[in-house]
Regions:
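Catalytic core of the metallo-beta-lactamase
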Residues: 23-37, 132-181, 199-203
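Metallo-beta-lactamase
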Residues: 106-160, 248-259
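Pre-active-site segment of Zn-dependent metallo-hydrolases
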Residues: 37-81, 93-94, 170-177
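Active-site neighborhood of phospho(di)ester-bond hydrolases with catalytic His/Asp-centered motifs
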Residues: 40-42, 77-88, 105-107, 163-169, ...
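Cap/insert and terminal regions of metallo-dependent hydrolase folds
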Residues: 109, 171-258
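Zn-dependent metallo-beta-lactamase
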Residues: 9-64, 210-213, 231, 252-255
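Active-site environment of divalent metal-dependent phosphoester hydrolases
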Residues: 26-28, 46-48, 85-90, 111-113, ...
Length: 259
């Protein structure tokens, strides 16, 4: 009986296009799979992320291999989304592991860096515009303050599911009728004690409710693991390891959610 049920589930998955959402690493990378498409967001595939030129200003060590490395999926990636030009989102050494002509959807500032480093298929995204990534549709939204001019939020949908991702602060004007999942920050980070650059858990839970999302997935986790001189300017309150009362998923590298 168990074998029959398993076979039925497999057949259903083959008939229906199921979106799979995967935590790409132990920080803020994500992977989406649907049909023959594999989309990587802010991929980090190196042992250490470094601030450009002056690495001692900001750096972070990887604790384990990324999902794409573990499963030998780097060459299977069909599209890349880079949400910001900051070095913890745009890791050049990681991106150099992909083909130079892979489609990359990103900001104007990030595109300058990519073009300078010989990537030939860069698309600069704009708020309220839609882009086709194979079987996925990418729709771009403005990020919340203070990131509204430097990064972006987005939804990614296929024929059955839709997710929302904001890597810093959500624009409080955004709302949706129905999301399968939202990927948000839950570890509050402030610069100089008053400029909030990452949401805390209570704000994230309120946004999950406002966005009408079934699941809340934590991103940008464990900010205390980021080191360097700049971190002395930050005040951090971590919550990612204790998401009580939250319908959450994908807590460890490689964990996935079928939507």
């Amino acid at each position: 009986m168990i074998i029959i049920i398993t076979m039925v589930i497999i057949i259903i998955y083959e008939i229906i296009d199921i979106m799979q959402l995967i935590r790409g690493d132990n920080y803020q990378s994500w992977v989406y799979s649907s049909e023959s498409d594999l989309v990587a967001v802010d991929p980090w595939l190196t042992r250490k992320q470094l601030f450009p030129i002056l690495g001692w200003l900001l750096y972070r060590d990887s604790e384990k291999s990324s999902y794409l490395e573990q499963h030998d999926q780097i060459d299977a990636v069909t599209h890349i989304i880079i949400t910001a030009h900051f070095s913890d989102h745009l890791d050049l050494e990681s991106l150099k592991k992909f083909k130079a002509d892979i489609p990359i959807f990103t900001t104007a500032e990030a595109a300058k860096v990519l073009i300078k480093n010989h990537f030939t298929n860069t698309v600069i995204v704009k708020p309220h515009h839609k882009y086709q990534l194979g079987s996925f549709e990418l729709e771009v939204y403005e990020a919340g303050s203070p990131y509204h001019s430097t990064t972006f939020a987005y939804t990614l949908r296929d024929v059955t599911s839709i997710i929302f991702h904001e890597s810093h602060m959500v624009d409080s004007n955004l709302s949706f009728k129905n999301l399968n999942a939202c990927i948000l920050t839950v570890d509050q980070v402030k610069v100089l004690g008053f400029i909030k650059v990452s949401m805390g858990i209570e704000q994230a839970k309120k946004m999950q409710q406002k966005l009408n999302a079934e699941y809340l997935l934590a991103t940008g986790i464990a900010p205390n693991k980021t080191k360097g001189l700049i971190t002395w300017l930050l005040s951090i309150k971590e919550n990612y390891s204790s998401l009580k009362g939250v319908n959450s998923a994908c807590n460890e590298t490689g964990d996935s959610l079928m939507l």
